[in-house]
Regions:
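Residue-level marker for well-ordered alpha-helical positions
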Residues: 6, 60, 135-138
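Substrate-binding/access-modulating region of protease and related hydrolase catalytic domains
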Residues: 13, 19, 85-178
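Intrinsic low-complexity, glycine/proline- and repeat-rich
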Residues: 1, 178-179
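Short coil-to-helix leader/linker segments, especially the first N-terminal amphipathic alpha-helix
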Residues: 1-11
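Subtilisin-like serine protease catalytic core
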Residues: 11-24, 29-43, 51-98, 115-119, ...
Length: 180
């Protein structure tokens, strides 16, 4: 481990809190499936509508932050990843549809997984309020909650009542400084 993910994450790892036994689902852009940071943690990869598209830096960054071996918050967690067409992410119904498809796929898969492999968290780098498809996404988040899955998204305030908007620290400062 030669990189510090910051926010005191290393001290958690030193205490044995590494994500072992945790299963994380991600719906994002096409993934570099052989990336050294997370390829050993990738348990399932499903590619919807991205054939021929290049892999995305965003999806790889999200996977690395989640389960990366040197920068991950939970480097021993398992990763279940659904890839969607990056051109479809945005503000319209056609943008919401791939997120609905990906989240539905993960929730359906979760019902088939053995207890020890069931998802604990799903990350979606997408937010919604009154967009077309927003009601359906909110219903899927409720379905996830009923299954004991926490859904991290840009709509976390609307779905969980949490007002979270970042660390508000200087990115050039000590990555473990949480005083801001």
């Amino acid at each position: 481990r030669n990189r510090n993910p910051g926010l005191g994450v290393r001290s958690l790892h030193e205490q044995g809190i590494t994500g072992k036994g945790v299963n994380i689902g991600i719906v994002d852009n096409r993934l570099l499936t052989d990336h050294v940071e997370y390829k050993g943690r990738l348990k399932m990869y499903r590619d919807f509508n991205t054939w021929g598209e290049p892999a995305s830096m965003h999806g790889s960054a999200v996977a690395s932050i989640a389960v990366g071996s040197t920068v991950g918050v939970a480097p021993e967690a398992n990763l279940y990843y659904v890839s969607q067409d990056p051109a479809k992410f945005g503000e319209t119904e056609e943008c919401t549809a791939p997120v609905l498809e990906g989240l539905t796929y993960l929730l359906d898969l979760n019902e088939l997984l053995p207890e020890e492999d069931k998802l604990d968290v799903i990350s979606i780098s997408y937010g919604w309020t009154e967009k077309k498809g927003g009601e359906e996404l909110t219903a899927l988040v409720e379905r996830a909650k009923e299954a004991g899955i926490f859904v991290v998204s840009s709509s976390i305030k609307e779905n969980y009542g949490m007002d979270f908007s970042g660390t508000s620290r200087d990115p050039a400062s000590n990555p473990d400084d949480r005083s801001a």
